[in-house]
From Swiss-Prot:
SMART domains: ZnF_PMZ. The gene is FRS1. Keywords: Coiled coil, Metal-binding, Nucleus, Zinc, Zinc-finger. This is Protein FAR1-RELATED SEQUENCE 1. It comes from Arabidopsis thaliana. InterPro entries: FAR1_DNA_bnd_dom, FHY3/FAR1, Znf_PMZ, Znf_SWIM.
Length: 687
């Protein structure tokens, strides 16, 4: 036997020794446990399947799983019943008239049972290693090769099936576009984008509701750990904070470091300690490289990429990031679980669109119901804590339920002061959490009322943790500092939705004005739709405002048309030697000019009288009107000065119609019918 063969045999023996399973062994997830059991089965010489799994009725998450030898059970049991002796729901072997003959059942009892703990980790509860049939110890490699080939064939088939299932049917594109068009009619800022292949297969659909961000860029963006996404976010949202999902980043460990994890059981725990146990960036860097060097992985390319992108996912680098409920450590299934209620795997595209709208509508109704409960129902206090009493009056019912869990959890925490900086009112505590079986570091600055905990619950969820509250209580504080009460979780959260345009000047562009009005309309629609009375009141106000604006628009249009008429059709009267020839012909001409001037004012006056209310605000005081008319009367006081009066009338005509101040808000008190009456009186006096 060559040295290479000897080393391979020794490596296989070493791997088998490290693949031994005992009760109490822990895993990060159900998938990791199953992958480990498959490796164990391959090393021993048998194959395994997932026989059963169970979800929690409360949360819908997996809490139990059972992996068995493929010869587990008997043919009769599999065909006749779907319930195992241990209470799990076991899939029946008979499907669509066929019997599963993939392997011979020998009623083998070998299995592995894992269960999910409260902290999310999975632990081995029970197992049976003995088989009642022959195992193929010498054919483990062949089994692995065969298993890999079957997986590849199964994967290829699934891909083909998925591609076929995504091909659009006749009318689907039209339905989709109609759906998006209707959404845009309801909400002008609704955005969508469709990506189709050359074969008319659907590749991607993207749409977003305008109410999600009110037209503002996102402050924080969470994505998977991907370099292309990293570059894309930097290009599109350069000022947003980009973070990676921790569940995705660390979830790649079994794949990237599986060969090391199987040999070194403490690797995962030590990496987690370096990530979560570091209070400063310097501490993390030191602890990280100690772990990497201890397990001789400094040359690992994947770990190098994680370290280079540490500011995107390591908690200690995200102290300034407020995720406000978005979780990076665990995958959020809220959207998927919500859709599962309305759609199934075989749901048609048309049915999906209908069910999606139904889901959104029910979500809105649930939010309205929750708002009503918050306003009219007081949450029950389960603790005499002053923090609980304080926030019961401030938080919404749903948020207070979450907050009260932390209040009650404070009884399991024991704080101990570690240090205090001289000259600065800053103290550091180490809080032992006996419920989570971990210790956390809390820093309290009494001068600035700033409290920071290494668990980072406030940054992740938006409310203070039990560790921070126990330190506040120990320091004599009886209320939570205001900076740790986010308004988005309070009863008056709606009042925060003040448009930015209320505080800053709207840019004088049509697009900006249109955007501002749409945002205001959205807010008004949300409030007015709460009751029929508010709806009717708002509709009446909107109709009245629309009529007023139409009348104002018509008036301005008439003034502009009058300006055009006087500028083009009325000749300019030229005077010579400051004398006025009062012969008949000139009188006729003057009458024509006088009539044109009257017509201009009459059209405007009749328009305003027909509208029955003043379009231009009546801000002009009596003194201002008297002063202005006094000037006109003074011009007419001397009958021999009729010529100059007539000139001033023409001057007034041109000035009144063409002067830009007519269209300014500050001159909106100008009343054409009043001026027309004054001009008539003045002409009578002259005659």
């Amino acid at each position: 036997m060559s040295s290479g063969e000897c080393s391979n045999v020794q490596l296989d023996d070493h791997r088998k020794n490290n693949l031994e399973i005992d009760e109490g062994r822990e895993f990060e997830s159900k998938e990791e446990a199953f992958e480990f059991y498959k490796e164990y089965a391959n090393s021993v010489g048998f194959t395994t399947i997932i026989k059963a799994s169970r979800r929690s009725r409360m949360t819908g998450k997996f809490i139990d799983a059972k992996f068995v030898c493929t010869r587990y059970g008997s043919k009769k049991e599999d065909i006749d019943t779907g319930l195992g002796t241990d209470g799990f729901n076991i899939p029946q072997a008979r499907k669509r008239g066929r019997i599963n003959r993939s392997s011979s059942k020998t009623d083998c009892k070998a299995f592995l049972h894992v269960k999910r703990r409260q902290d999310g980790r999975w632990v081995v509860r029970s197992l049976v290693k003995e088989h009642n049939h022959e195992i193929f110890t010498g054919q483990a490699d062949s089994l692995r090769e065969l298993s890999g080939r079957r997986k590849l064939e199964k994967l290829n088939g699934a891909i083909v099936k998925e591609v076929k299932s995504r091909k659009l049917e006749d009318g689907d594109v039209e339905r989709l576009l109609n759906f998006f068009t209707d959404m845009q009619v309801e909400n002008p800022f609704f955005f969508y984008s469709i990506d189709l292949s050359e074969e008319q297969s659907l590749r991607n659909i993207f749409w977003v509701d305008a109410k999600a961000m009110h037209g503002c860029r996102p402050r924080v963006i969470l994505t998977k750990h991907d370099q292309m996404l990293k570059e894309a976010v930097l290009e599109v949202f350069p000022s947003s904070r980009h973070c990676f999902y921790m569940w995705d980043t660390l979830g790649q460990m079994p794949e990237k470091l599986g060969h090391v994890i199987r040999l070194e059981k403490k690797l995962v725990d030590e990496i987690n300690d370096a990530i979560y146990g570091s209070c400063q960036s310097e501490d993390f860097e030191k602890n990280w490289w100690e772990v990497v060097d201890r397990f001789h992985m400094r040359d690992n390319v994947w770990l190098q990429s994680l370290y280079e992108d540490r500011e995107y996912w390591v908690p200690v680098y995200m102290k300034d990031v407020s995720l406000a409920g978005m979780c990076t450590a665990q995958r959020s299934d809220s959207v998927n679980s919500g859709l599962d209620k309305y759609i199934q795997r075989k749901t048609t595209f048309k049915a999906f669109l209908e069910q999606y709208k139904k889901m959104i509508q029910e979500r809105y109704e649930e939010e309205e119901k929750s708002e009503i409960e918050t306003l009219y129902k007081q949450p029950g206090l389960k603790s005499p804590s002053p923090f609980g009493k304080q926030m019961a009056e401030v938080y919404t019912r749903e948020m207070f339920k979450k907050f009260q869990v932390e209040v009650l959890g404070g009884v399991a925490c024991h704080p101990k002061k570690e240090s205090e900086e001289d000259g600065v009112n800053k103290r550091t505590f180490r809080v032992q959490d006996y419920e989570q079986n971990r210790s956390f570091v809390v820093v309290w600055n009494s001068e600035s009322s700033e409290v920071v905990c290494s668990c980072r619950l406030f940054e992740l969820k938006g409310f203070l943790c039990r560790h921070a509250m126990i330190v506040l209580q120990m320091s004599g504080e009886l209320s939570i500092p205001s900076q740790y009460v986010l308004k988005r979780w309070t009863k008056d959260a709606k009042s925060r939705e003040v448009m930015e345009s209320d505080q800053t000047d709207v840019e004088s562009t049509k697009a900006q004005r249109y955007k501002d009005l749409c945002l205001r309309s959205l807010k008004l629609s949300e409030e007015a739709s709460l009751s029929e009375e508010s709806y009717n009141a708002v509709v009446n106000v909107l109709n009245e405002a629309l009529r007023k604006w139409e009348n104002k628009s018509n008036l301005i249009q008439n003034l502009e048309e009058s300006e055009s008429v006087t500028a083009q059709d009325l000749p300019i009267h030229e005077e010579q030697n400051n004398t006025y020839d009062m012969n008949k012909d000139d009188n006729v001409a003057d009458t024509g000019q006088e009539y044109s001037l009257q017509e201009v004012w009459k059209v405007t006056a009749l328009q305003e009288q027909r509208n029955r209310y003043s379009i231009l605000d009546d801000y002009l005081s009596a003194q201002h009107m008297s002063h202005e008319m006094g000037q006109i009367n003074s011009m007419a006081s001397n009958r021999n000065g009729y010529c100059s009066v007539h000139q001033n009338i023409h001057s007034l005509q041109g000035q009144s119609i063409t002067h830009p101040r007519l269209y300014e808000t500050e001159q909106s008190s100008f009343r054409p019918e009043a001026m027309y009456e004054r001009l008539q009186d003045m002409v009578k006096d002259l005659n």
